[in-house]
Amino acid sequence: MGRRNNTNVPDFILTGLSDSEEVQMALFILFLLIYLITMLGNVGMILIIRLDLQLHTPMYFFLTHLSFIDLSYSTVITPKTLANLLTSNYISFMGCFAQMFFFVFLGAAECFLLSSMAYDRYVAICSPLRYPVIMSKRLCCALVTGPYVISFINSFVNVVWMSRLHFCDSNVVRHFFCDTSPILALSCMDTYDIEIMIHILAGSTLMVSLITISASYVSILSTILKINSTSGKQKALSTCASHLLGVTIFYGTMIFTYLKPRKSYSLGRDQVASVFYTIVIPMLNPLIYSLRNKEVKNALIRVMQRRQDSR
């Protein structure tokens, strides 16, 4: 962001999702409700895992960090979106790039964390007897720290390159938050090199994590098919079902939105996809990982019982 003097734009105007006051009020109520559910679900998931000793396992260690990322991810976007729906659509130059940095950082971190979770499921199903030895505390910490470090570097490089853009006198961002595609579309200079760099960073993040997840699930499926008992197969499948559903939803919207050239950016279509993965998915993840999970339900019951007994 050292070359801010290259632009005459002190701030940006976010066009939002609608010009209609009635629609804006309806969206405000809807997004506020979703955000409150997101906060409650993710904070609740973190607290249950922290308070119940039986959930102090690698699987739930990763799930704690997924909830933290989803909570942070939603907080980077939703509060500003809510404010824009009621008041001014302005966001400062620095505020815009700060939002972009944390958005890219947390999005990439979730990609790599989902890979770590897939590897955890692979070890649990393919090498159950060696699981406690392989998934040591040291390895678990590395599988969580790695995504944060790599994603920080990824996002930092992304924002440094984006800060080199010239915006001339145009400052209307045709989106409801500061994402890379609409900011690139706003620039009055040749963005080819920056687009290539962003596609390399985004593409490598998605491909590395997807290859890791795919390889893990191919091995998992191969192992499940070798299980003779029907109950054993169902138990193994149920262990992975929630994670696989979360991966499918998250990666589906990310690939649809980002792995395409700037010229194919569509305001309405891309905004719907963006609402889904920035506001809706952080709300869905706690539901996906808890509703079908008996361990989480039982842990919640135990925590509530202990609280009642302590009174």
Swiss-Prot record:
GO cellular component terms, semicolon-separated: plasma membrane
InterPro entries named among the record's database cross-references: GPCR_Rhodpsn, GPCR_Rhodpsn_7TM, Olfact_rcpt
Regions of this protein lying in the Cytoplasmic compartment: 47-54, 120-138, 217-236, 292-311
Glycan-carrying positions: 5
Membrane topology annotation: Multi-pass membrane protein
Protein keywords: Cell membrane, Disulfide bond, G-protein coupled receptor, Glycoprotein, Membrane, Olfaction, Receptor, Sensory transduction, Transducer, Transmembrane, Transmembrane helix
Major localization listed first in the record, in broad terms: membrane
Transmembrane intervals: 26-46, 55-75, 99-119, 139-159, 197-216, 237-257, 271-291
Highest taxon of the lineage: Eukaryota
PROSITE patterns named among the record's database cross-references: G_PROTEIN_RECEP_F1_1, G_PROTEIN_RECEP_F1_2
Subcellular locations according to the entry: Cell membrane
Extracellular topological intervals: 1-25, 76-98, 160-196, 258-270
Disulfide bonds: 96-188
Single GO biological process annotation from the record: G protein-coupled receptor signaling pathway
GO molecular function term, any single one: olfactory receptor activity
Keyword Transmembrane: yes
Family named by the database record: Belongs to the G-protein coupled receptor 1 family.
Task performed by this protein: Odorant receptor.
UniProt name for this protein: Olfactory receptor 8H1
